[in-house]
Design a protein with these regions (language model features):
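Hydrophobic h-region of N-terminal signal peptides that target proteins for export
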Residues: 10-19
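Eukaryotic helix-grip
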Residues: 20-196
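Sec-dependent signal peptide recognition
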Residues: 1-9
Length: 196
């Protein structure tokens, strides 16, 4: 009887993990689709901001596009270089990023965001990033998704701030589409529950 109970508990746990992974894949697929994005703002320098309601989710997705002359591989190099975020993220003093491991074009990392406002708690999360053009398809450069706490091992869990609100629902991606000679439409797409 104890064995059957243990098997049932493990099976339930594995089903929950698979459901979270499936949910993450659905988010990535929805962000990738170009349908149903609503243009919210456009500027003269080609910046465009969009929003999108995703069915079954009580959150908005956001997308920013800009035409640039930056080599898309350079975007992969910069965004996946977690150790140097302080060199290109303007508010990096409020962001702590630590790479946990990396293999085959994907990495796992921990981020802590310090919120310097009264009555607001810091936020933190673990995430997985795939930054390998060969591992992704079509025009994707990078995709990332948040990792559920249940999937974090004990050693990595020691990095988590117990007082921060954990964010476990979110995903994003960088896309690049050629729009002319040495010009690319770069798109960053994001959906995340800010918690609290």
């Amino acid at each position: 009887m104890l064995f059957k109970g243990l098997v049932l508990a493990i099976s339930t746990f594995l089903c929950l993990i698979q459901a979270k992974e499936k949910q993450s894949n659905i988010l990535i697929d929805e962000l990738y689709q170009d349908k149903l994005w609503v243009l919210e703002k456009s500027t003269d320098d080609s910046l465009k901001i969009y929003s999108k309601k995703i069915n079954g989710i009580n959150l908005m997705a956001f997308r920013v596009n800009k035409t640039v002359t930056i080599d898309p591989l350079e975007i992969i190099n910069v965004v996946s270089d977690l150790e140097n975020y302080a060199n290109f993220i303007s508010n990096s003093k409020n962001l702590k990023t630590e790479k946990l491991d990396q293999n085959d074009g994907s990495l796992r990392a921990y981020q802590h965001i310090k919120i310097s406002l009264p009555l607001f708690s810091d936020r933190d999360y673990f995430f997985k990033m795939i930054a390998n053009k060969e591992a992704l398809y079509n025009d994707k450069l990078i995709e990332w998704s948040l990792i559920d706490l249940e999937r974090i091992n004990e050693m990595d869990m020691s990095k988590k701030d117990e007082n921060a609100i954990y964010l476990d629902y979110g995903a994003g991606m960088w896309l690049s589409r050629p729009v002319g000679e040495d010009k690319f439409d770069i798109s960053y797409r994001l959906i995340m529950d800010p918690g609290g």
